Every structure is written in C-alpha cells, then in structure tokens.
A protein has these predicted regions:
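Short alpha-helical donor nucleotide-sugar binding micro-motif in glycosyltransferases
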Residues: 309-310, 318-322
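A conserved catalytic-core segment of Leloir-type glycosyltransferases
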Residues: 14-15, 51-115
C-alpha cells in the first residue's frame, strides 16, 4: 500500500492509532501548545493517540485521553533557542556533535517503534522530526513549525542538507502558513506546491468572549490555584507568586487594557510595544518568560504588569479582559497562534504585518468592517505606527468596538477551530503523499 493510500484511509475513519512525536514539552511555546491541542482534538474525535515528548508532568494538561510517553535521553536535548529546562540539558542543534545527533534520533526512533504499529506518525519540526520519522521505519508526516527553519537551519548548509534528505522519505510535509512553505522552498528546495498548508487551531469552546465580571472572577480564581513560586526558588516557567492579588489590584477600574502573550526575547518585539505604550493612555499586562524579562521589566513603567507565563486556564479569562492584544514580533513567525486565540476571545489582535502574522491579519481583514480593516496590523518594527493604530483601536465607539470584537471571533470560527484543523491535517496528509 502506498503512503497516499494508507493516509487516505486514516482520513476517512475514526478509531485509528496516531502517534505524535514532539521533542519538547506540552506547555509554553507555540509548538508545545500545538502538540497538546492536536492530541486532544484527535482523541476527542475517537482516535487512539500517543504523544511522545519530553514533558515531565503531563498530568497537568487535558489531552482528551491521549497517552504520553517520554523517550529516555542519555545526551543533550537539541534546541533552537537556549532556555532552561526542569530536568533536561539543552544544547543548540547546530552545536551538537554527529554522535550526539545520532544518539538523540535513535533513542527517539526506538521509542516510536516500541509504540508501533500506527496508522499515522506525525513528527514535529523538520529537524529533528524528519530524522526521527525516517529512522522509525514507519510511514511518517512531518509538520514544519518555523523555529527550526529560522533559528537553526538558516545559514547552516549541513543542517539543510540533512533536512532535505529526511523529508524525501516523508509521506507528506505540512506547514501552518504560506510563509513557512516559502521558507522550506528557500532552505531545503522543497517546492511550496509539495507542502500542504494547514493553519494551527484554536479551542473555540474554551476560548470565547466573556462578560468582564465573569472573566475577572475566573482569572483571579485560576491565579489563586497556582502553586507558590517564591523569589528564592523562582521557576521562570511557572506563574509569578502572588498573581491573584497583583492582578486584582492592577485590573481594578475600567482603564483600557493591552495584552501581550509570548516569549520575552528580543525577536518578539516586546521592547517595541513598551515604546509604543509610552504614547498611549492604557495599562498593559505582559505574559511570558524568557531571557529578556529583567531588561524589559526594568524599562517598563508602573502601568505595565509582568505575570510570568500563564496557562490557558488563565488566558481563557484574561484575553476577554483585553481591549487589544498585540503581537509585535520583529522576527518571522510561522503563524501567530496567540493572535488567533485572542481573537477567539473577542480581543482584537494587532499584529506586525509580516510572515505568518500577515496571514492572520488577512483573515481578520476579511471579516472586519471596511472602515476598520486597517486596524488588524501595523508595520513591522515601527513603534510610531503601532502606537497610532493602538490608540485608534482603544478609542473606538462602543458600536465599532463590538463590531471588531465579533468579527475577530467570526474569523477564528471560520478558519482556525481545532476540530477542523485536526481533520484537515488527516485530509492534507492523504492528499500530500510524496511519491505515493
């Protein structure tokens, strides 16, 4: 049976066995959330799902019944950007020795084989998802996320050649946006016509507009549930200590609120947002962790609150409280999931117009009233343009604000629900069999 035939069968039925290989965690950054939500959507659709990843505490997450297997690692964890991990030793992919790379691939491939056979193996990231899939001996589909392309493969011909070799054996290659497909063509020589575009998804049942009183009460209740995280043993990957009291005080009153959710690193443009906020009468909540936090917090004024990273149980209540959600990245983004999630909650996103974020903006603009379409995006790296559009969004009349909020939600329901995305991946995989 060819790759196309067996994948077509997967797309037609339920109750099949699906393996998802993901080299990292299940919380925090975009590909982690992607893996978690896809596993849950497929599980809820009646499939038998196993997630192979490095998450040390999977019980914290609702995976809809999916099982988690953690492959044993004897060496370092290959990463694209250095972060701290609870019980893994990260090392930049480009700095790994050949022996370290081969050991990582084989240990993960062995874990995949032990869970086989499967109707579908989905591996995340061109590297190292492609090599792990190829070494597993199972038919595999590779999902490109973007971070591996920009932070590891760009400028490294050897890594690009390795990716090209392992993608050749994939049944299909998926990307979340036309931008990522274009980068794949640029770096690997894989024509964009060979890549199937399936945008990431949003849990539209959990992430929805809520009345302010309900949303604030829910946010404070979830924050009160957080485990202690005192300064003397602070874990940057967990919410800050005392967030419930801090948020209660900070969000008192009806002053306009701007929200940022994402990593705190230079390429995410948070400094640009802080610069723009100095020209706007608003308060801002900054959610996330990363190497630039101390510098950003020192540069922020009293109208800005940093919370550390929050989980979706918090964000489901925080996004509805935000008058605007800003995604100011200055570096290419594969898609911009947090912008879509904000839109699902009725919080109008304002995104930098480039890469995958431009595709988010295009989806919003198709739903926005004509006279408000210019408020979906701003010019990358332009703090003045960001400030102007942010001020205009915050000054909308009640009718226009309601129209933009409803349109943002509608854009997500039409394009980016997880249930639809999960089925689209199966269908795209069946259509995209390479050489099958």
């Amino acid at each position: 049976m060819s790759g196309g035939e067996w994948l077509e069968g997967v797309a037609r039925v339920t109750g099949v066995r699906i393996l998802i290989w993901h080299g990292y965690l299940l919380g925090g950054t975009g590909s982690n959330v992607y893996t978690r939500e896809l596993a849950r959507a497929w599980s809820r659709a009646g499939h038998d799902v196993v997630v192979l990843c490095q998450e040390p505490r999977p019980e914290r997450f609702d995976l809809g019944g999916a099982r988690v297997v953690r492959p044993r690692l004897d060496g370092p964890l290959p990463v694209f950007v250095l972060d701290r991990y609870e019980d893994a030793r990260p090392k930049l992919l480009g700095q790994l020795s050949r022996a370290e790379r081969e050991r990582f691939v084989e240990q993960n491939a062995a874990a995949v084989r032990a869970e086989g056979p499967a109707d579908l193996l989905l591996t995340n990231h061109v590297l190292l998802g492609g090599p792990v899939g190829a070494a597993s001996g199972l038919p595999y589909v590779v999902k490109a996320h973007g971070s591996e392309l920009e932070f590891a493969m760009r400028g490294d011909p050897a890594l690009c050649a390795w990716a090209r070799e392992t993608l050749a054996g994939a049944s299909a290659v998926l990307a979340g946006s036309e931008h990522v497909a274009g980068v794949l063509d640029e770096l690997v020589g894989l024509p964009s016509t060979s890549v199937r575009i399936v945008p990431p998804g949003v849990d539209v049942d959990r992430l929805r507009p809520r009345p302010r009183t309900e949303a604030l009460a829910g946010l404070l209740a979830e924050s009160a549930r957080d485990e202690p995280n005192p300064p003397e043993r602070h874990d940057e990957r967990r919410p800050d200590d005392g967030n419930a009291d801090r948020l209660r005080a900070f969000l008192a009153g009806d002053r306009p609120t701007v929200l940022y959710v994402g990593k705190l690193s230079a390429e995410k443009g948070v400094g640009l947002l802080l610069e723009a906020l100095r020209k706007v009468d608003a308060r801002a909540v900054i959610v996330g962790f990363g190497p630039a936090r101390a510098e950003l917090e020192a540069a922020a004024g009293p109208d800005v609150l940093f919370t550390g990273p929050l989980e979706h149980r918090h964000l489901a209540h925080l996004w509805p409280l935000a008058d605007v959600s800003v995604t100011p990245s200055v570096f290419p983004e594969a898609f911009g999931m947090v912008a879509a999630e904000a839109a699902a909650c009725g919080s109008p996103p304002l995104v930098a117009r480039h890469s995958g974020l431009a595709e988010i903006a295009a989806g919003l603009e198709q739903e926005y009233p004509a006279h408000l379409r210019h408020l979906a995006a701003f010019e990358r790296g332009d703090a003045d343009d960001l400030a102007r559009r942010l001020a205009e969004l915050l000054a909308l009349s009640p009718d226009d604000r309601a129209a933009v909020s409803a349109a943002a939600r509608r854009a997500v329901e039409k394009r980016w629900s997880w249930a639809g995305v999960a089925q689209s991946i199966l269908a795209a995989a069946s259509r995209g069999a390479l050489g099958g």
